[in-house]
Design a protein with these regions (language model features):
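Solvent-exposed loop/turn and edge beta-strand elements of beta-rich ligand-binding domains
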Residues: 1-216
Length: 216
């Protein structure tokens, strides 16, 4: 086993030559990187220093945003009238922005995004109610809803998510957030007044009817 790499990323060892070729294999990696599982053949030369460069890939992440909302799926008719039935379903056409919730720093210490910087604008959910942002550096992010689908209320909700290192054998970190929105609602008020005096009158009874087809 060779010593760990130093500040320059180098490690060396002196061995007695008992064969022409040995192999070099990475055992562990610095935090934030993926383990290189390849074995490198190294040909030994007496009295010479043989060099081998091993390059590690940084662990990256993907972030998926899911959108749910109530959809009219039916109606129940009773003696008291009609009550609508709503079901929570996936929603398309929701729009989101992603921001850095803290400085986003690569594994080698490079600052990729400063805190509050815009990482991606205009992420829009598809027919499956989701949208995915790939190739993110590990760190803390904020997802903010910019626009809700038709008939749903956009409150400008924000959610924070931390994409953390998952170990040297995990190729990609997967993270997700789910947004749920209330449907837009309407209320109808009816007031009964005397035509001449404009006083409010008790006892009036009214029915509310559909002016056109209401479809689920």
């Amino acid at each position: 086993k060779m010593p760990a790499t130093d500040a320059n990323g180098a490690s060396s060892v002196t061995i007695t030559k008992t064969q022409d070729t040995v192999y070099l294999k990475e055992i562990s990696v610095p935090n934030g990187y993926l383990l290189d599982t390849k074995a490198y053949d190294v040909k030994l030369v007496i009295g010479d220093t043989v060099k081998q460069t091993v390059t590690d890939a940084e662990q990256m992440a993907s972030l998926t945003v899911y959108k749910l909302g109530e959809v009219l799926t039916g109606a129940k008719v009773t003696d008291d009238g009609v009550s609508f039935v709503y079901t929570e379903q996936k929603q398309k056409s929701a729009v989101y922005n992603v921001y850095a919730a803290a400085d986003i720093v690569s594994a080698d210490g490079t600052v990729i995004y400063k805190k509050d910087a815009l990482v991606k604008a205009g992420l829009t959910t598809g027919d499956d109610g989701s949208v995915t942002l790939d190739n993110l550096y590990l760190g803390k992010y904020v997802v903010k809803e910019m626009q809700a689908p038709q008939n749903l209320v956009c409150t400008g909700e924000s959610q924070e998510i931390t994409l953390s290192y998952a170990g040297s054998n995990v190729e990609k970190v997967m993270g997700s957030v789910t947004f749920k929105n209330d449907r837009q609602k309407a209320s109808v008020s009816v007031y009964k007044q005397d035509k001449e005096t404009r006083k409010y009158l008790p006892g009036g009874t009214y029915g509310l009817y559909a002016g056109n087809d209401i479809k689920a």
